[in-house]
């Protein structure tokens, strides 16, 4: 196991600093082997393309989807979320191992920016989902048992409906995430 010296004062990483001892370093290989790994690049490329495809295929069309098509849409959105989560988890955990490392800070910032840009085309999903009449969703659930398992997720999203802003403001707030994280 690789260990990292735990420094009392993060701003002074010199050998003369007082150490609290050695701490274990996270093994992030289950996520990605390194910042240049082909898997990481493949996930970033896939995410960029899939976000665009998802928006092209489903934006403005949720109300017209059959139960099985709606399930496909939800599963694709879920996969996008999982890949995004994997990317940001790797970048974040790597950064938190050594917050004074400029390269790690830049890598985290770059990943955050890419995910924010790629996912901006997905803002429509929750907004459209919240515009669907309750009756519409209630009619879809009995048609597809697997889709009905997502009802608690939809209920949680729809509970925020009273606080939903216009599409333009929601997109602006999403895009401000890049600036806010800088």
Language-model features: locations:
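A well-structured
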Residues: 1-182
């Amino acid at each position: 196991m690789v260990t990292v010296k735990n420094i009392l004062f993060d701003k002074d990483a010199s050998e003369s600093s007082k150490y609290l001892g050695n701490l274990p370093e996270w093994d992030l290989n289950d996520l990605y082997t390194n910042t240049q790994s082909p898997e990481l690049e493949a996930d970033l490329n896939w995410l960029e393309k899939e976000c665009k495809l998802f928006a092209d295929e489903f934006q403005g069309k949720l109300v017209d989807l059959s139960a099985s098509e709606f399930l496909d849409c939800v599963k694709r959105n879920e996969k996008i979320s999982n890949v995004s989560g994997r990317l940001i988890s790797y970048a974040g955990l790597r950064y938190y191992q050594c917050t004074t490392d400029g390269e790690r800070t830049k890598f985290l910032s770059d990943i955050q920016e890419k995910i924010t840009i790629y996912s901006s085309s997905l803002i429509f999903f929750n907004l459209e989902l919240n515009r669907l009449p309750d009756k519409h969703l209630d009619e879809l659930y009995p048609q597809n048992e697997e889709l009905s398992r997502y009802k608690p997720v939809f209920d949680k999203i729809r509970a925020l409906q009273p606080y939903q802003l216009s599409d333009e403001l929601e997109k602006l707030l999403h895009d401000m995430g890049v600036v806010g994280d800088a």
